[in-house]
């Protein structure tokens, strides 16, 4: 997951780690599968993050997508990124 994020989106190492961890937690919870009837895969995540505005970092894109899921289904707020440790960034 982290490698796929690095290839496609700007962000810091800490953001990539945090988003990858949140994605694992979301997948383990099987919430997307239950709500949308589809498996949560790296491709599904990347496709949805690509829909976010271009100027957003990877963590902001993640929160943008999770915000949409929260509005549509509820129960996604706990998977959003709240804080990210400071780290080196990739553009």
At which residue positions do the language-model features occur?
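Acidic, polar-rich N-terminal leader regions of halophilic archaeal proteins
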Residues: 1-91
